Amino acid sequence: MRMLSRNATFNSHGQDSSYFLGWQEYEKNPYHEVHNTNGIIQMGLAENQLCFDLLESWLAKNPEAAAFKKNGESIFAELALFQDYHGLPAFKKAMVDFMAEIRGNKVTFDPNHLVLTAGATSANETFIFCLADPGEAVLIPTPYYPGFDRDLKWRTGVEIVPIHCTSSNGFQITETALEEAYQEAEKRNLRVKGVLVTNPSNPLGTTMTRNELYLLLSFVEDKGIHLISDEIYSGTAFSSPSFISVMEVLKDRNCDENSEVWQRVHVVYSLSKDLGLPGFRVGAIYSNDDMVVAAATKMSSFGLVSSQTQHLLSAMLSDKKLTKNYIAENHKRLKQRQKKLVSGLQKSGISCLNGNAGLFCWVDMRHLLRSNTFEAEMELWKKIVYEVHLNISPGSSCHCTEPGWFRVCFANLPERTLDLAMQRLKAFVGEYYNVPEVNGGSQSSHLSHSRRQSLTKWVSRLSFDDRGPIPGR
């Protein structure tokens, strides 16, 4: 009999979540504008593909960086050999400068307090390994990124206790919600070691208010616990209010750099979302605590960033003309694309939480549910995936307490494909429901009593050929 470890067989990876199941269905039948026009359109992937042309243009003008040359001389052998686990100094300096630039240079970062990791997934898990032991807990506000169930729990043995937030105040964190989560952990005999937040929020697509950040700092200071701020979407805040880093609020409070709260606030960053480079696997841990930095550096040996990647990105991020233009253009394009999605949803009678950041919208489909239950939410989600052929993420996969919310991504697909997705959704809503267009605000609707016919025919009809020639053909 084949014997595997408990970690290998324990069902805490989250692969049975509807979030991952939607991906599996997409991979079986992926949409292609020529070869599979009736396939599933991927709107469950938080990738930023809107500014690749800016990076490709820079690479074309700076061939030495990609060719591993410096002053005309090859440095391939130098990069191919073992490097210090601390990372290339030039890259760490470029990285902290870019982090500061995204935050409007309101805060600065010390490269000696930065630990490089193979993506934000590794960074978050490393933080949990550093701060908590198996059987202890972290508090996370809902709704939250479904992957946290895998990233934070699977190998660490740490528990997640949700901080339940609701639509009544736009899913903002409240003192009551924090205290209730802490008390719930105590009832379960779980020692709370920290709070982890994502700012800007995934899946809400909103930035945290200054008051929320002050509240969090007061809470962790009072409880004597840590605060991890996952800020991997910090460069995606495209509308006011602007993004505020937890480090900025620490500075505003004039915290003593030797105080416990100063030492217990940490940041996760990555280039996956802001630069659209998830395949490069570049993440970072930032902490004011020397012991955390030392421990994380040791653990980073299990997930290093290649020296070739560091060299290329060091050259790219050190070009201030590029970074200034990229940040501004990225904001502009994200705002335009988000507006397009919101407009398309409104034509189907569907509204969204008012968002100002991220690569997705938090979409309100409560009025389309058969009943106010998570069973009804899953029923609607299955129709959208299997009949409408759109992969979106149901709120239940994000641990939302209210049925009927969905995360819909907009930056990972061409504009033409987004148009097609909105046509499919509008046809679906018109077929199944009686819903007026939204002109701002939520809408109520009634289930259509007409015969519910298969949507296969109209899905087939909504191909690009029916909407005119493809530009450039």
UniProtKB/Swiss-Prot annotation:
Question: Does this UniProt record's set of keywords contain S-adenosyl-L-methionine?
Answer: yes
Q: Which reaction does it catalyse?
A: S-adenosyl-L-methionine = 1-aminocyclopropane-1-carboxylate + S-methyl-5'-thioadenosine + H(+); (2S)-2-amino-3-butenoate + H2O = 2-oxobutanoate + NH4(+)
Query: Gene3D superfamilies annotated for this entry?
Result: Aspartate Aminotransferase, domain 1, Type I PLP-dependent aspartate aminotransferase-like (Major domain)
The listed outcome for residue 46 to V is: Reduced activity
Top-level lineage group: Eukaryota
- SUPFAM superfamilies listed in its UniProt record: PLP-dependent transferases
Any one GO MF annotation of this record: pyridoxal phosphate binding
Q: How, per the record, is this protein's activity regulated?
A: Inhibited by L-aminoethoxyvinylglycine (AVG). Inhibited by L-vinylglycine (L-VG). Inhibited by S-methylmethionine through a L-VG ketimine intermediate.
Name the residues that bind substrate: 84-85, 145, 151
According to the UniProt record, what happens if one changes residue 85 to A?
Strongly reduced catalytic activity
Q: Signal peptide position in this chain?
A: none
UniProt-listed GO biological process terms: ethylene biosynthetic process; fruit ripening
One Pfam family hit: Aminotran_1_2
Q: Which residues carry this modification: N6-(pyridoxal phosphate)lysine?
A: 273
Q: In which pathway does it act?
A: Alkene biosynthesis; ethylene biosynthesis via S-adenosyl-L-methionine; ethylene from S-adenosyl-L-methionine: step 1/2
What UniProt keywords apply to this chain's record, in alphabetical order? Answer: Ethylene biosynthesis, Fruit ripening, Lyase, Oxidoreductase, Pyridoxal phosphate, S-adenosyl-L-methionine
Under Enzyme Commission nomenclature, its number is: 1.4.-.-, 4.4.1.14
Q: Which CDD domains match?
A: AAT_like
Under the subunit heading, UniProt states: Homodimer.
Q: Which family does it belong to?
A: Belongs to the class-I pyridoxal-phosphate-dependent aminotransferase family.
Q: What does the protein in this record do?
A: Catalyzes the formation of 1-aminocyclopropane-1-carboxylate, a direct precursor of ethylene in higher plants. Also catalyzes the conversion of L-vinylglycine (L-VG) to alpha-ketobutyrate and ammonia. Can use S-methylmethionine as substrate.
Would you tell me the protein name for this molecule?
1-aminocyclopropane-1-carboxylate synthase
Q: To which species is this protein native?
A: Malus domestica
